[in-house]
């Protein structure tokens, strides 16, 4: 029976009897519904395969809820453990204010996070819902630190600045609106600070074939950074960057550039802050991308795969004894993250640790990257700049239209879900558990779609 026949008046008051076919119509009455046309079957989907509850089609998921499902959907270590499912249900009944009322599941999560993902040099932790708020609180920590360092009081604190990169996406909340600069539609008409912004020296791949261009881009960016520090007259509180700019185009920043920026921060008494919301929790082959780049950040914002977002702090933050991690309610929120998310995250992190998933990511990431490079070699006029660190992989297409058409064909003809980024890039965000034969299917879908687009020109 069709939607109109069952609900001719658009009345969905019998929500207990809502069917998969009704989902889009029910949502459209109250919301902008511009996502995928499938309806996620939460029971039938598994691993890297999403099932459409309407058509029963299976989709290879290289999206993973915007890189937030580390072990895919319905991981066996969760759904096949009845005792754990009961534990998760108990945690979901109530939503306690974790910063004020403590519990065993909360403490277990914190200890597990510190053991599996923690950095001994960044012992301070803060948890909150949402990646933007993770970055927001990292910025607050840096701004407070700098204000105390300089002995500033209001209104002089308004002079403090945050140095950041072009093509950054740090979120869509208060302070982060002044940093995000990918698509104008995400920040237009919202008041923003005029904080200093320098070019992003994204590596062209393979780096060995673009040494001169890459070095020149980094030289210009570093010169602009020096000029920004000089112009700010000591008022830059921090520099923040994504080690790999996700939404901005999967732009990889070199270890040499980021190390140079870290030195500039030290020379100018500013904190060095990394946004690892998308690149953290193992997708690059280590807990954090910065661990492969020879960096020692003072603050790291995290989220997505960690289920609970937040900030790791340490380094020079403790040069100010009354920093935000040490003063009651200086940074806080009602729930300080969600307890049910923490219980789920604990099991996910235990599974990651037990199965040594990060080692697998290194191997599968190389396999994926080799396949993308081979595809680029076979279609040099269409596929370029194949790149990746671990499973955080991407390619460029000639223009936005071509990229969008390739994505459309992958989805409609091959049931493969991937993501756009930047002006003409196509990115892959699979679960850390994706198998080689599933990578093969992804590569075949991409190759077939690229061929179809090339032949239609």
From Swiss-Prot:
Recorded GO MF terms: L-lysine 6-transaminase activity; pyridoxal phosphate binding
* Group of enzyme by EC: transferase
List the thermal properties of the activity.
Optimum temperature is 30 degrees Celsius.
> Pfam families in the record, alphabetically?
Aminotran_3
Q: Which residues bind L-lysine?
A: 172
Assembly mode: Monomer.
Protein name as catalogued: L-lysine-epsilon aminotransferase
**What is the native source organism of this protein?**
Streptomyces clavuligerus
What's the gene?
A: lat
